Amino acid sequence: MARQVFDDKLLAVISGNSIGVLATIKHDGRPQLSNVQYHFDPRKLLIQVSIAEPRAKTRNLRRDPRASILVDADDGWSYAVAEGTAQLTPPAAAPDDDTVEALIALYRNIAGEHSDWDDYRQAMVTDRRVLLTLPISHVYGLPPGMR
């Protein structure tokens, strides 16, 4: 598959932050918006987010995997939106399963090392955490300096 070419200024907005607004599609077609913390991998052009199985955004994505993430720049006016088709892991079911391992990698990418990985692993299972991976298929927005 050929690598997509996106505006570097818009990718810089996504890369320069770790908090955005995830938009999913409700059963009636209206958007459902959630503030999320994310990790952007610029080499693979994908965004990853930890979400929980019983939540609306997860149900929405299992029904319709189309999603967008809005990221604001520091100036308050500039922004980038990344769109794609979400891929979801199964919910974490055991402290040593593949989903928990993927969530640990995400945590490390966002925050570094955790003070108690055993506690973290159990929390991922208790919360029924899921890894959302959003390969970016389209980016649009208003880069800094364009207003």
From Swiss-Prot:
Report the EC number(s), separated by commas if there are several. 1.-.-.-
Q: Which domain of life is it from?
A: Bacteria
The residues that hold coenzyme F420-(gamma-Glu)n are Q32, Q37, S50, A56, K57, T58, R59, N60, W77, S78, Y79, H138
Keyword Cell membrane annotated: no
Parts forming coiled coils: none
Q: Decide whether keyword Membrane is in the record.
A: no
Keywords, alphabetical:
Oxidoreductase
Gene Ontology MF: a single term: oxidoreductase activity, acting on the CH-CH group of donors
Which GO biological process entries does UniProt record here? vitamin B6 metabolic process
Q: Which NCBIfam families match?
A: Rv1155_F420
Family (UniProt): Belongs to the F420H(2)-dependent biliverdin reductase family.
Q: How does it assemble?
A: Homodimer.
The record describes the protein's role as: F420H(2)-dependent reductase able to catalyze the reduction of biliverdin-IXalpha to bilirubin-IXalpha in vitro. However, kinetic parameters show that it is less efficient than the biliverdin reductase Rv2074 and suggest biliverdin-IXalpha is unlikely to be the native substrate of Rv1155, which probably catalyzes the reduction of an alternative molecule in vivo. Binds coenzyme F420, but does not bind FMN or other flavins. Cannot use pyridoxine 5'-phosphate, pyridoxamine 5'-phosphate, pyridoxal 5'-phosphate (PLP), the anti-tuberculosis drug PA-824 or aflatoxin analogs as substrates.
Q: What is this protein called?
A: F420H(2)-dependent reductase Rv1155
Species of origin reads Mycobacterium tuberculosis (strain ATCC 25618 / H37Rv)
